[in-house]
């Protein structure tokens, strides 16, 4: 777990400096970015979660998913965007300000959200 956390911190550094980090694991795919939007094509059998890595992500808008939100604030002390799924061919996660991580997780056989 120490290396997983180190990878997230390194991804945060990349986002602060204008980049986007991608972390791949066994059944997990994460994107770390700041102050912009990302489009994520539908993945059957996967869930989608959004986390604030900075103290606050403001202006969070999530569309194309079962649970959407518009111009919402996410905080790193409260999990608001966990375990979502696609409702269209593409999910869009927009962050006006702050550093976010979108984590895609492969669902186990028979698992549904």
Regions found by a protein language model. Give the residues of each.
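Anionic-ligand-binding alpha/beta catalytic cores of soluble enzymes and soluble regulatory domains
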Residues: 1-39
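Long, charged alpha-helical interface segments
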Residues: 26, 33-113
